[in-house]
């Protein structure tokens, strides 16, 4: 099991189907569409075109334009694998926001409010809607894309909820965009799969209305194809400042306060309250440029398994996360904790030696095994008894700049439960809280000066086939009101040195802000 959005394949794969010889594959006939509609009430209409001269970022620039709601998901991996698919979309049919214990829904020009947590509202929306099966359909053919912030943990864990302190106008804890039209880049076949789904319930049993919905979906796929292939390429962004200086960062902690916080965590550990707590600080800098240029820069300097660019109205989220939260595909659950880091070596020999040093570092091993056990417990709460398995224990996974210790966990989701139960059980990841998880989160709430917001939450998608894929929102930047914000944490244990932990968080954040510096100098 690989850690990335959706699928990975060997770079030497020969899985090029005969359809790859066709320049343009038209959507299925209405008769074929009707047959598929008997298998599910969410039916995909797909147009497939050769796309060997296009890139996901270029297509996104053509499709999204100035759209205030859009997304791009990519897996940009090095080494011996490439990620097969990239996904993008714009102009969602519906926006769902979770604000405290209520849900705000925007659709058809109207805004409605529900006294229900957002995950329950979204679960109810998907219930009864099922994707018609089609062999070869791309893994994500429409559904919800967005994020759920760290503070939404109160939705899943009563011990973290304090109903007496709920604000009248709570901040946004989660945002999902619902898309009927999705574009998938298939790197293996060098094709563009343009998908438009039809919800047959909207036909109201009318054959004529169903035909109208089908025709509209076909026309939509053609319109999207034309926008990609006929719209002039976006001009190269000109350099604004060849002598741009390093970004000036501001933190929500003073250095002294953060280091005192580390000491308080160590006191909790000495008292037996916890084994580890991840203490974080938020850095911000001024930025009034185009966030997409930050994504392009981040893609170049920090390629990662989970790359994402989300336009969400008044905010934009840009990230390059290395770590899965949880994946639910059918009844299978996957979880992949990461803990333990070394830099990449300058030579193959040095690289190997650094990896071996990581694998034999007792402190790194102890921390990693603590998080593996926490992950096994999280999966075990929603899985068949005895189904939680450990694969590739403490495997060294190499990325562009660093190598990590990683372990793959898998299990079978218990009958009667669904992906929302899996998400609730694993959220947030132990790698961004500490252990025991609930007590660590209580200490975080006591010590950190502000709510975490998106940081340490998850960026995710959910489709109409009951699948979920999610990553941990680390190495993530939120852009809003002329500011770019990055949060970074350090895992505090009994022998942590406060000064070192402070420097670690600064260095992690600075690595993200280098993308701003690159964007401001010009790409």
Predicted regions located by residue number:
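N-terminal non-cleavable signal-anchor helices
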Residues: 7-10, 219
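Extended alpha-helical targeting/anchoring segments
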Residues: 21-523
């Amino acid at each position: 099991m690989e850690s990335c959005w959706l699928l990975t394949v060997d770079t030497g794969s020969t899985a090029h189907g005969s359809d790859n010889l066709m320049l343009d594959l038209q959507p299925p006939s209405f008769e074929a569409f009707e047959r598929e509609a008997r298998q599910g009430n969410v039916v995909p209409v797909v147009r497939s075109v050769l796309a060997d001269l296009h890139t996901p970022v270029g297509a996104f620039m053509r499709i999204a334009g100035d759209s205030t709601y859009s997304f791009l998901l990519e897996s940009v991996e090095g080494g011996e694998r490439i990620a097969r698919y990239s996904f993008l979309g714009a102009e969602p049919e519906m926006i769902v926001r979770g604000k405290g214990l209520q849900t705000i829904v925007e659709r058809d020009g109207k805004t409605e409010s529900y006294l229900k947590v957002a995950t329950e509202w979204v679960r109810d929306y998907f219930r009864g809607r099922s994707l018609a099966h089609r062999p070869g359909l791309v893994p994500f053919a429409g559904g919800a894309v967005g994020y759920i912030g760290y503070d939404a943990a109160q939705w899943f864990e009563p011990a973290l909820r304090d109903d007496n302190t709920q604000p009248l106008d709570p901040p946004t804890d989660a945002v999902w965009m619902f898309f009927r039209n999705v574009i998938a880049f298939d790197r293996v076949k060098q094709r563009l799969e343009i998908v438009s789904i039809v919800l047959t319930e909207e036909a109201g049993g009318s054959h004529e209305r169903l035909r109208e919905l089908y025709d509209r979906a076909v026309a939509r796929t053609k319109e999207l194809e034309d926008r990609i292939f006929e719209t002039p390429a976006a001009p190269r962004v000109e350099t604004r400042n060849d002598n741009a200086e390093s970004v000036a960062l501001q933190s929500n902690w003073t250095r002294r306060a953060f280091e005192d916080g580390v000491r308080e965590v160590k006191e909790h550990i000495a008292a037996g309250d916890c084994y580890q707590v991840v203490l974080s600080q938020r850095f911000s800098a001024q930025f009034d440029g185009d966030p997409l240029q930050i994504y392009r820069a981040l893609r170049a300097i920090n390629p990662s398994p989970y790359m994402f660019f989300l336009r969400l109205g008044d905010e934009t989220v840009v990230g390059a996360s290395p770590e899965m939260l949880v994946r639910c595909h059918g009844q299978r659950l996957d979880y992949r904790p990461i803990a333990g880091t070394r830099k990449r070596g300058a030579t193959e020999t040095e690289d190997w030696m650094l990896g071996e040093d990581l694998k034999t570092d007792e402190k790194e091993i102890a921390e990693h095994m603590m998080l593996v056990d926490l992950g096994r417990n999280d999966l075990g709460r929603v899985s068949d008894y005895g189904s939680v398995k450990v694969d590739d224990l403490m495997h060294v996974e190499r990325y562009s700049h660093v190598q990590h210790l990683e372990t793959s966990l898998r299990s079978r989701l218990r009958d009667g439960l669904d992906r929302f139960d899996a998400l609730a059980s694993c959220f947030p990841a132990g790698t961004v809280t500490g252990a025991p998880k609930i007590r660590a989160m209580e200490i975080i709430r006591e010590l950190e000066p502000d709510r975490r917001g998106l940081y340490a939450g998850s960026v995710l998608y959910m489709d109409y086939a009951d699948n979920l894929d999610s990553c941990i929102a680390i190495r993530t930047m939120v852009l809003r009101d002329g500011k770019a914000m990055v949060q970074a944490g350090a895992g505090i244990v009994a022998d942590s040195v406060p000064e070192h932990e402070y420097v670690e968080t600064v260095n992690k954040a600075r690595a993200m802000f280098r993308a701003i510096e690159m964007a401001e100098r010009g790409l």
